[in-house]
């Protein structure tokens, strides 16, 4: 057992460096091509001329598509999904290393060019890839799946600064169980990855800075639970829209470069209305949490960002939809909170409270992982006082969503690429 914990520590270190490598590559490309050193794609888009804001996501999608198509022709095989660690856990625990690296590079291109897709998917993939490479050299074959799981959890912990949520992501979403024998090394890897990532970044700050001064009372629990019901209804709708957009892009029968370029062009067009559609939504989430906008502003940005996410994911842009889902949930919660705030004197606090609730519950509704979703929001924001209410709301959202839409976002993604 102790040798497993030692290996888990090594896996956590490797995962932290894999995530840091991808993050620094992003910053380098943003500096080279967008003249942006802030780390925020929204800031980069704001400072670009309209024609560059329009064309940059399309050119990034075109470059990524050419890379994927070139690799497909070179290897004479159909590309796999970018989330290969899920396939590896469901099969024999082996990776196609070269294909995974190519997809990570393609993800780097679309992410840094502004597509509304998550960068964390590629980070987690690289972390799992590093863990797999180490495991195949130093561990027996029957343990390979365990170390891939540890790498994925560690990558998630380093990307989101949420080690417990990263561990439970593996337990709830990938393993479908919470066996202690498997969970121990996973938690060790996740915690080590977070600590090493903090050392690399010279910071142990929370992912999101939130100033929530409300003390949760009976009324607030009722509002939180009602938000869970709303998210439980919105989750299946979001999954249905994503599936419909994917089918729509496929029906066009475009070559991969042109399909990804079309998705990027749609993002570019939407960015002419608001630069907030660029990127995975992290900086927009932070700005909303710092100062919740008015109802109509939230609604406008929400609609544009939703269309951008659907265009990016539907076109097949390699990357994750985890962080974009957090923004969509935040916007839904804040829209609900702003509407209710008209009837309460503390409308600002209600808006912020229900925004955080929306993040957790929509994540639970799309992943069907309520415990992970609850812990993730608490770890990212430090608002652990919300834990009891969020847990109830996330369970409700997950149950409603699972009733209306059997597949989670991950199973749907795997089915689309199978």
UniProtKB/Swiss-Prot annotation:
Which keywords belong to this entry?
A: Cell inner membrane, Cell membrane, Chloride, Chloride channel, Ion channel, Ion transport, Membrane, Transmembrane, Transmembrane helix, Transport, Voltage-gated channel
Q: Where in the cell is it found?
A: Cell inner membrane
Provide Cytoplasmic-side residue ranges.
1, 75-145, 201-221, 279-290, 337-351, 401-418
Q: Show the stretches that span the lipid bilayer.
A: 2-22, 54-74, 146-166, 178-200, 222-242, 258-278, 291-311, 316-336, 352-372, 380-400
Q: What is a single Pfam family found in this protein's UniProt entry?
A: Voltage_CLC
Q: Name one GO cellular component term.
A: plasma membrane
For side Periplasmic, which residue ranges? 23-53, 167-177, 243-257, 312-315, 373-379
The protein's superkingdom reads Bacteria
Q: Which CDD domains match?
A: Voltage_gated_ClC
Major localisation:
membrane
**What residue range is the signal peptide?**
none
How does it sit in the bilayer? Answer: Multi-pass membrane protein
GO molecular function, one example?
A: voltage-gated chloride channel activity
Could you provide one GO biological process annotation from this protein's UniProt record? cellular response to acidic pH
Free-text function comment from the UniProt entry: Probably acts as an electrical shunt for an outwardly-directed proton pump that is linked to amino acid decarboxylation, as part of the extreme acid resistance (XAR) response.
- By its UniProt entry, which PANTHER family does this protein fall under? CHLORIDE CHANNEL PROTEIN CLC-E (PTHR43427:SF6)
Family per UniProt? Belongs to the chloride channel (TC 2.A.49) family. ClcB subfamily.
Q: What is this protein called?
A: Voltage-gated ClC-type chloride channel ClcB
Upper lineage: Bacteria, Pseudomonadati, Pseudomonadota, Gammaproteobacteria, Enterobacterales
């Amino acid at each position: 057992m102790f040798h497993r914990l030692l290996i888990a520590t090594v896996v956590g270190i490797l995962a932290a460096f894999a995530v840091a490598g991808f993050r620094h590559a992003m910053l380098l490309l943003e500096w080279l091509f967008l003249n942006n050193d802030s780390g925020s794609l929204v800031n980069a888009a704001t400072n670009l001329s309209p024609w560059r804001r329009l064309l940059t996501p399309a050119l990034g999608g075109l470059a990524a598509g050419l890379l994927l198509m070139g690799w497909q022709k070179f290897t004479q095989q159909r590309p796999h999904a970018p989330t290969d660690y899920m396939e590896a856990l469901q099969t024999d625990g082996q990776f196609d290393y070269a294909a995974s690296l190519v997809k990570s590079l393609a993800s780097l291109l679309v992410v840094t060019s502004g597509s509304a897709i998550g960068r964390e998917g590629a980070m987690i993939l690289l972390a799992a890839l590093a863990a797999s490479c180490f495991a195949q050299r130093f561990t027996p074959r029957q343990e390979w799946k365990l170390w891939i799981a540890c790498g994925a959890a560690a990558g998630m912990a380093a990307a989101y600064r949420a080690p417990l949520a990263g561990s439970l992501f593996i337990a709830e979403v990938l393993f479908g169980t919470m066996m202690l024998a498997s969970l121990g090394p996973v938690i060790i890897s996740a915690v080590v990855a977070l600590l090493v990532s903090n050392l690399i970044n010279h910071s142990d700050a929370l992912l999101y800075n939130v100033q929530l001064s409300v003390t949760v009372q009976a009324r607030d629990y009722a509002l939180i639970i009602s938000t869970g019901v709303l998210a439980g209804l919105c989750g299946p709708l979001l999954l249905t829209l994503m599936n419909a957009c994917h089918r729509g892009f496929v029906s066009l029968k475009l070559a991969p470069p042109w399909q990804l370029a079309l998705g990027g062009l749609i993002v570019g067009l939407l960015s002419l209305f608001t630069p907030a559609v660029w990127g995975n939504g992290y900086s927009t989430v932070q700005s909303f949490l710092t100062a919740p906008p008015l109802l109509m502003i939230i609604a406008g940005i929400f609609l544009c960002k939703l269309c951008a996410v659907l265009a990016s994911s539907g076109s097949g842009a390699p990357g994750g939809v985890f962080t974009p889902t957090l923004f969509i949930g935040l916007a839904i919660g804040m829209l609900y909170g702003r509407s209710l705030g008209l009837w309460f004197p503390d409308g600002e606090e209600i808006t912020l409270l229900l925004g955080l609730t929306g993040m957790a519950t929509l994540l639970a509704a799309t992943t069907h992982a309520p415990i992970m979703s609850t812990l993730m929001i608490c770890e990212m924001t430090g608002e652990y006082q919300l834990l009891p209410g969020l847990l109830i709301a996330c369970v409700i959202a997950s149950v409603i969503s699972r009733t209306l839409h059997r597949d989670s976002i991950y199973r749907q993604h795997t089915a689309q690429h199978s």
